[in-house]
């Protein structure tokens, strides 16, 4: 008598791995607070918290290319067609996008940082612009690197994306623990690089790996136009969402004391831990629905 094994739907596997990943990431973020306050002090950690608010803003640096590509991959899979040319085209466009935003950040970092971090001018003095620019670079690597995860989700192996994402945050936390227990003196910029740069670098390494595999694939003008046309709508939606959901950091940077900013940050981390249950299911179901 054959025993028929229960097949777990792929979206539940992805959702389950996403829950585990988000728990690890939220745990890292919450645990890092006490270490960062010990390393930097309350006022500098408040600055660190404001800079991490740029992470969501920098998620728009791919111009919606990742989400547009994810939909095309799902559509091609449903029709049993190759989507390699779409991936290569998207990676070319994302490279142009990141160059554009790096130039944009370099030009406007001085003006924006002077306003955004105006409450901490005495602490930062003339380091405001470079600190803001460095933060944008680190978080932009995460924004562009997210394209790698969009590809994996579209290929219905989102558990790999969740694994890589959780691993990258754990590496950042290990770096922070090394600094803390070694008693190494670091500033805000280096603390931010140690904790968040691995998050961007791991996903970017996967993008390089996929590009090398697709080096021989030929692309046409129609592939680029298709990606841009699909991505523009997602980019606009992302911008509107950011404006609505991230205005709070602009307000607290001007109105709250360092102690209040720290308290607000902790509260938002806890809220994010609860909110991930919904987002994990949505993230897992999206590519499946797109193939229907």
Spell out what each predicted region is.
Residues 162-212, 268:
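Hydrophobic alpha-helical transmembrane segments
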Residues 11-12, 139-164:
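Membrane-interface junctions at transmembrane-helix termini in multi-pass inner-membrane proteins
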Residues 1-11, 126, 185-193, 204-245:
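Interhelical loop/hinge segments that connect adjacent transmembrane helices in multipass membrane
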Residues 9-71, 98, 102-106, 138, ...:
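Signature of the first transmembrane helix
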Residues 119-145, 192-197, 201:
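Alpha-helical transmembrane segments of multi-pass membrane proteins
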Residues 63-78, 154, 271-292:
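Helix-loop junctions and terminal segments of transmembrane helices
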């Amino acid at each position: 008598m054959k025993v028929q094994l229960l097949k777990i739907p792929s979206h539940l596997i992805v959702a389950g791995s996403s829950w585990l990943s988000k728990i690890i990431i939220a745990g890292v973020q919450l645990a890092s607070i006490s270490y960062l306050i010990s390393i930097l002090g309350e006022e500098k950690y408040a600055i660190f918290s404001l800079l991490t608010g740029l992470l969501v803003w920098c998620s728009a640096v791919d111009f919606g290319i990742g989400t547009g590509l994810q939909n095309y991959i799902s559509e091609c899979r449903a029709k049993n067609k190759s989507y390699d040319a779409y991936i290569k085209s998207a990676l070319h466009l994302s490279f142009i996008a990141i160059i554009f935003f790096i130039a944009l950040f370099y030009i406007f970092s001085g003006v924006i940082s002077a306003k955004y971090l105006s409450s901490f001018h005495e602490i930062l003095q003339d380091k405001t612009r470079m600190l803001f620019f460095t933060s944008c670079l680190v978080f932009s690597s995460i924004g562009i690197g997210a394209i790698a995860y969009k590809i994996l989700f579209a290929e219905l192996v989102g558990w790999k994306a969740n694994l890589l994402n959780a691993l990258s945050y754990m590496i950042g936390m290990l770096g922070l623990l090394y600094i803390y227990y070694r008693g190494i003196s670091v500033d805000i910029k280096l603390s931010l690089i140690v904790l968040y740069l691995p998050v961007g670098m791991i996903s970017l390494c996967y993008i390089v790996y996929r590009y090398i595999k697709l080096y021989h694939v030929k692309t046409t003008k129609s592939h680029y136009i298709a990606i841009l046309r699909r991505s523009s709508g997602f980019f606009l939606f992302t911008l509107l969402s950011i404006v609505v959901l991230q205005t709070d950091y602009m307000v607290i940077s001007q109105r709250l004391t360092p102690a209040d900013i720290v308290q607000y940050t902790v509260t938002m981390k806890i809220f994010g831990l609860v909110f991930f249950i919904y987002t994990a299911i949505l993230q897992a179901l999206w590519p499946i629905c797109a193939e229907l």
